[in-house]
Amino acid sequence: MQIHLKTLGCRLNEAELETWARQFRQLGHGITTDPDTADLLVINTCAVTEEAVRKSRRLIRRTHNSNPQAKLVVSGCYASLNPGETGDLPGVDLLIDNREKDQLPSLVNTQLADGTMPVIATEPGENPLFSRGRQRAFIKVQDGCRYQCTFC
């Protein structure tokens, strides 16, 4: 898989990109400087100022629009401070919180390796099904399947 890495903000974000590139290579992936040819796009966002937040949102949208077929992973301060807003942006397949940034390449490998579905699609809901009086669960088939349920 070809991966394009992009960052906004501080030197720490830049250092993390270097670490991720090394880890992705160790997992057998290639790193590309061309986002249009990448299979996976990783954006490390910033939220130190309102302008940085705007730039983060703009970069996520622009990156997705330039290569909508690629998976899009977003991490960094903007993603961690505003996960709902970030996850609602078009094309975002996976959010990685700052607490898990050191595991980003392995999380990407496990969470996105088996298809296109976002992580949230197979996480248990806040309320169990029986507490809502339901006998059936809903599966969003348009999001794909990672074959991790008891049915498979």
Question: What is each of the regions a protein language model found here?
Answer:
Residues 1-152:
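Proteins enriched for Cys/Gly/acidic motifs involved in redox and nucleic-acid/cofactor modification
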